[in-house]
Amino acid sequence: MKNNWIIILVLVIVIIAAVLYLIGYFMRKKNQEQLDELEVRKEALFDLPVFEEIDDIKKMHLVGQSQNSFREWNQRWVELSTRSFAELESQIYEVENQNEIFRFMKAKKAVVEANETMTEMEAEVEVIRNGLKELRESEERNSLEVQKALDVYEELSKSLKDDKASFGPAYSEIQKQLRNVEIEFTQFVTLNTSGDPIEAREVLEDAERHTYELEDLMKRIPPMYEELNETFPDQLKEIEEGYNQLLADDYVFPEQNFAEEIQHAKKRVENSMADLEKTEIAAVEVANRDTATAIDALYEVMEREIEAKKYVVTNQKIIDDYISHSLKNNRQLMIELDHVSQSYTLNNNELGRSRGFQTEIEEIIRRQKDLEPRMKEHTVPYSEIQAFYKECYKILDDIENQQLEIDASLKELRKGEKVAQEKVDEYEFRLRSIKRYVEKQRLPGLSADYLEFFYVATDRIEDLSRALNKMRINMDEINRLCDLCEDDLELLDKKTKDLVNAAALTEQMMQYANRYRHTHENIRAALDKSMYLFSTEFRYQDALDEIGTALEAVEPGAFKRIEDFYFKNINNPNLTAI
């Protein structure tokens, strides 16, 4: 039994030893694998072309802030590749040592620390490389800008040499400024080489700025010089020669200082040329705009007088004829007005207006006579004559239109008289027709109101007839009377129809109401009163209202039924009183 326990104990120890061995083996293997991975990462890190990237940037000859940035990134790389690398190597050695002596837990901790160091180094390298990349790209861009400025400078030098004549008096100043730019670029190279990056950068910025300013200057000067050297002188010469020729051709200019304006423009060109020599471009641009405006104004004055002469030559005879035509028409109009005024009253001041036309035409003739000697002596500008002619056209056109209007109104007077005479005949016929119509009804009589209105209408027609038979007819009064007669007859016609219809309806209502005379006292009384109003006072509408009201009280709807029947058969003499 004791031997069995010994065997079991030995087996347990063997098993435990085996398990511990296996655990140690696997832990050692795992630590070694992590160590191998760490070695791979370390090799990969130091295989990165950081040294080459740093060397490439060194060759770029950085200056100023760029050089400071590069020094910072380079220092961080030096620290990483020395101090951090040494620390990493120490940690790797520690892992290997602990792993060899089976201190697996310490080895594992050392592996973790080494991995952390490795991760930090990888992150730092990434930051350094990105910084170097950005610095390189920035410098490449700057180099391109510098090269671009140098290319512009070279182009400007070539342009100045090839197109010397296009810069005129500004050539010397431009050449001087170009030489200054060249000196600045040379100074930049010297300072950059000698190791003064800050001042070198400032000089470079000045050189670039002056280069582009000079480029702008050299673009703007040639067109300005062309204006001052060719365009303006040629135009002023043309204006001066044209002005002298126009004076020789007897033109007169209202502008007394025309020749002085030419000299002022010439002087402005001279001053601008002096400013151009000093490359005072802003002043030259303003002056050239003013000069161009002044020259345009001079051209405009000459063209105005040339066009005015053409207008005067074309319209001179037309104006003379037009004045004669207007004068003749007005005389004829005044004769016609005098003749018409013997038969008609003129209500629109036609005679006064025609006398006003005469005064206006005579004023035009007077002004024309004042101009004639000045035109012959060539002491008046054509533009002044043109303005007078245009004013004449406006006045004469207005007179012509009013003359035609008055002439048409005179013709309308005769037409109006004829129409009014026809209306008198028509009104008299309508009045007689109404009278015959009323007589035909055989009414017992007519009310005073109706007769009064009938006589008013009759008197109005007689007034119209008398107005038409006067020695001088007032057509305004006649037209007013015509309108009143028309209104009177329309109203009389309505009153007549109302009167006749009321009388006829009263008779029918009374005839119908007789059936109730003996049975209804109110009907009997209404019949008596209605008969009195009808036969004695001839108030047919009142009689109708009286009997109609009583009948409606006895037999509702009877009044409306009889009225409807009457108007439905009003044109049937067998069924109605009419």
From Swiss-Prot:
Ranges of the Extracellular topological domain: 1-8
Matching InterPro entries: EzrA
GO CC terms of this entry: plasma membrane; septin ring
Subcellular localization, as worded in the UniProt entry: Cell membrane
Topological domain spans for side Cytoplasmic: 28-578
Domain of life, source organism: Bacteria
Residues in coiled coil: 103-165, 256-285, 394-490
Annotated transmembrane regions: 9-27
Keyword Lipid metabolism: no
Recorded family membership: Belongs to the EzrA family.
Role, per record: Negative regulator of FtsZ ring formation; modulates the frequency and position of FtsZ ring formation. Inhibits FtsZ ring formation at polar sites. Interacts either with FtsZ or with one of its binding partners to promote depolymerization.
Name of this chain's protein: Septation ring formation regulator EzrA
Species of provenance: Enterococcus faecalis (strain ATCC 700802 / V583)
Gene: ezrA
